[in-house]
Amino acid sequence: MSPKRIAKRRSPPADAIPKSKKVKVSHRSHSTEPGLVLTLGQGDVGQLGLGENVMERKKPALVSIPEDVVQAEAGGMHTVCLSKSGQVYSFGCNDEGALGRDTSVEGSEMVPGKVELQEKVVQVSAGDSHTAALTDDGRVFLWGSFRDNNGVIGLLEPMKKSMVPVQVQLDVPVVKVASGNDHLVMLTADGDLYTLGCGEQGQLGRVPELFANRGGRQGLERLLVPKCVMLKSRGSRGHVRFQDAFCGAYFTFAISHEGHVYGFGLSNYHQLGTPGTESCFIPQNLTSFKNSTKSWVGFSGGQHHTVCMDSEGKAYSLGRAEYGRLGLGEGAEEKSIPTLISRLPAVSSVACGASVGYAVTKDGRVFAWGMGTNYQLGTGQDEDAWSPVEMMGKQLENRVVLSVSSGGQHTVLLVKDKEQS
């Protein structure tokens, strides 16, 4: 064997790996269609991005961002937008660093501002007080903090929040990021799930109940250092690999390569589709989603409810029913299995806020239901809607809706002008 071959076997230091070696990641969840950002609801900490004088909007309002946007995500009290060129803009509450940028100038958190990242970003996710950005070569940057019932637990290090982006140390490329209120799920190119953040309700899928409160004897590192969710696969060696993952506020859904739906975390209103209401600390293969004719393609979870969709464009809901958040009509009660929301046209995506639900239809309209208190439904009223209501407004005229995302008290839409025929 020539010495040249032997030399090649040694792995070079990470910083010596040439840029061209880096793999470009892709996943069906990456958005590429550019549009305009609209916000509505309550915005007293700037999460609407409409400046210091606008505290609420009962109808969608246009946010001024200097570039076309391909993804717009609502966190608990902040909003994150990804531009077509791979830049990240943020606005809203920055107390814990969720904006990832300096907002010392008064009012600068109330309007979109750019996050300093040298990398091209292909996907963002946002929680209550954290934000994640996935780069085109599969690295994840994170900023803000995670909290549990007792307050801040830190971000990547115990008790330390970060006001600027920091890279998550993982030696495998990530293809998708998803955020719950206080946890982050990363899906790798190999189909592994890495989780970090708060684990109190089981939402990390890898921390036993005994250690879920602040990590037990190992401390917060157990929660904040990303680790893989290991689940033995039946009948074969190795472990279950996943093709997709989604988060609710305190829970996680993951779809395996075989198409099975797994869930872990809070299910106190059956929002995971479990027969019981105990939290699940390890992934459960959810029998309520087993139906040979359906393949599940999208999930979104609020505080206590879930809205999901199948490959035929039908939307379903389960979990807590108060305030109409299931969209199943007046007087609907709690559901422990996915229940068809019958009054909707064919759907292309679904989303949940804390106590609201949304569906974007294949023809580019958006329907909303649930709690009306924060004006998140776009009806102009603060009454609850027990059935889906089509969202209307001046900014929606002659436009198609590309996506919707919803936080604690505000909602963000991505829209584009209808093509003139």
From Swiss-Prot:
Region of interest (Disordered), ranges: 1-36
Protein name (Swiss-Prot/TrEMBL): Regulator of chromosome condensation
Phenotype when changing residue 4 to Q: Abolishes N-terminal methylation
Subunit structure of this chain's protein: Interacts with RAN. Interacts with KPNA3. Interacts (via N-terminus and RCC1 repeats) with KPNA4. Interacts with ARRB2; the interaction is detected in the nucleus upon OR1D2 stimulation.
One family name in Pfam for this protein: WD40_RLD
Positions of post-translational N,N,N-trimethylserine modification: 2
Species annotation: Homo sapiens
Residue list for modification N-methylserine: 2
Record's comment on post-translational modification: N-terminal methylation by METTL11A/NTM1 is required for binding double-stranded DNA and stable chromatin association. Di- and trimethylation produce a permanent positive charge on the amino group, which facilitates electrostatic binding to the phosphate groups on DNA, while inhibiting histone-binding. Methylated tail helps retain RCC1 on chromosomes during nucleotide exchange on Ran.
Outcome of mutating residue 9 to A: Decreases KPNA4 binding. Strongly decreases KPNA4 binding
Localization terms from the record: Nucleus; Chromosome; Cytoplasm
InterPro entries: Ran_GTPase-activating, RCC1/BLIP-II, Reg_chr_condens
Function: Guanine-nucleotide releasing factor that promotes the exchange of Ran-bound GDP by GTP, and thereby plays an important role in RAN-mediated functions in nuclear import and mitosis. Contributes to the generation of high levels of chromosome-associated, GTP-bound RAN, which is important for mitotic spindle assembly and normal progress through mitosis. Via its role in maintaining high levels of GTP-bound RAN in the nucleus, contributes to the release of cargo proteins from importins after nuclear import. Involved in the regulation of onset of chromosome condensation in the S phase.
Modified residues (N,N-dimethylserine): 2
Example of a GO MF term: nucleosomal DNA binding
Keyword Lipid biosynthesis: no
PTM-bearing positions, type Phosphoserine: 2, 11
Resulting phenotype, residue 21 to A: Decreases KPNA4 binding. Strongly decreases KPNA4 binding
Record-level GO cellular component terms: chromatin; chromosome; condensed nuclear chromosome; cytoplasm; nucleoplasm; nucleus; protein-containing complex
Lineage: Eukaryota, Metazoa, Chordata, Craniata, Vertebrata
